Amino acid sequence: MRPLTDEETKTMFEKLSKYIGENIKLLIDRPDGTYCFRLHNDRVYYMSEKILKLATNVSRDKLVSVGTCFGKFTKTQKFRLHITALDFLAPYAKFKVWVKPGSEQSFLYGNHIMKSGLGRITENTDKYQGVLVYSMADVPLGFGVAARTTQECRKVDPMAIVVFHQADIGEYIRSEDTLT
Amino acid sequence: MASCSIEDVLAKAERDEAEKLKSITVLKELDLEFDPGLLLAFDKNRLDTRDFKGNKREDCLRSLARDNTQLLINEIWKLPTERVDEVIVAKLPEPTTKLPREKPAPKPKPPTKWEQFAKLKGIQKKKKTNLVWDEVHKEWKRRWGYKRAKDDTKEWLIEVPATADPNEDQFAKRNKAKKERVARNEYNRLKNIARAQKVKVPGTGLLPTSQQTKAELAQAVSLAKISTASVGKFQEKLPKEKPARNTGKKRKFQPLIGDFSSEKQKQLDLLKVMDSKKPRLDITKAVNKQMREEDSESARNNKKGFGKKGRKGGMPGKGKGKGKPGGKGKAPKGKGRKPQMKQGKR
């Protein structure tokens, strides 16, 4: 486990800012204690200082996970968000998409969201903007990337993809053995 | 009674005397083997086990040791003796018994680089005669060293080779070459020692070579650059010069549990920088805003004609309460929208 280098921090923040914008500040500067990001096995974990100090007692090869996994760095040093980060990102989301109950299941199986399944979408959403996906009952379901702007969404045909799937809470079951 | 006692006493005294001064002749069933060179004697006689195991063990051992020592000393007296400073000294012969050595046998010397190479190539040492015939002096001279035959350092004239620079000092050149060879040999010798003792070979640096390769030149440049008093800190750089590769810079990470507040501050600063890098005017955003306004404008116009409302697929979002009708329901109608779409797709 080690702190992130400047380069890695930048890569991660750029990815996070796609979803929560400048609200990253609220993750770093928390009133309820010191929280930090740490890299372990190419994965970024978000944890409190207390947990970190406890985790130092565990040897590196035995440590599977600590705190919350936010995502991982690929071999090409790109950052990929994991679904485990959802709980921390959902409260600060800037752009949201609500999915109709009928296509919720389809999204949770890892499919893109079609226009027909789109319940609501935040006004002003840009193309390729990172969005958080909610059910109509405001339960966060996952992340995605807007394939169309809000304007374009009105005009496209019902089978057109509106939001690209990135991660969903179905992964907790689908990729149970790789999530940490 | 009295006489008896006197006889007894005398006999006892005699016995005690005999005990004190034991005879120098010792009888043994088997003769002992001696190695007077090492003052060594082997007793091959059987031990009396009854005595040995019983309570007279100490006495038995002491008498055995005394007898055998007596025999060894008898043997020493048979050797030629001489008198040195009032002391009689026996001259010991060479020892015949082989004793194991005290220290482990020395390991063979690790081969030098040349010896390794020669073994690989099957090169064997050839014995050359020490003396060779010198045609010039008409006499036998040593093959190498001082006053050697065909001594090229003693030449009073050197022919300038056709390819060489005529102004070059051939004597100086020869001297310099010799010095370099000597230095190189010394360096190799030290390297062999270092390798034999498994010490890390000291920084190789650059060796004089006749023709430097590109890599060697690059190494020479990078070495020369950092060979200043400031370790190259103020060294000027060429335009477009690449940093030297393999300079040995290691990755350094911050400590796992370091200063949390400074870590936080660093991340906040990074966020600030990232924020300031964003353009003030996001063109796509501006265009989208314009499109949206035009949309709502035309929708308001259309609303006058058609009072029908389709709420499905409405996008309230951050609805500004403009009284905007459902976008989807109206979509197929507005012909005036086509140019806007194109604008959006730009």
From Swiss-Prot, chain A:
User: According to the UniProt record, where is the region N-terminal domain?
Assistant: 1-92
Under the heading SMART domains, the entry gives: PUA
Which keywords appear in this protein's UniProt record, sorted alphabetically?
Nucleus, Ribosome biogenesis, RNA-binding
The cysteines joined by S-S bonds are none
Cross-referenced Pfam families: pre-PUA_NIP7, UPF0113
The subcellular localization recorded is: Nucleus, Nucleolus
Function recorded in the entry: Required for proper 34S pre-rRNA processing and 60S ribosome subunit assembly.
As for family, the record states:
Belongs to the NIP7 family.
Q: What is this protein called?
A: 60S ribosome subunit biogenesis protein NIP7 homolog
UniProt organism field = Danio rerio
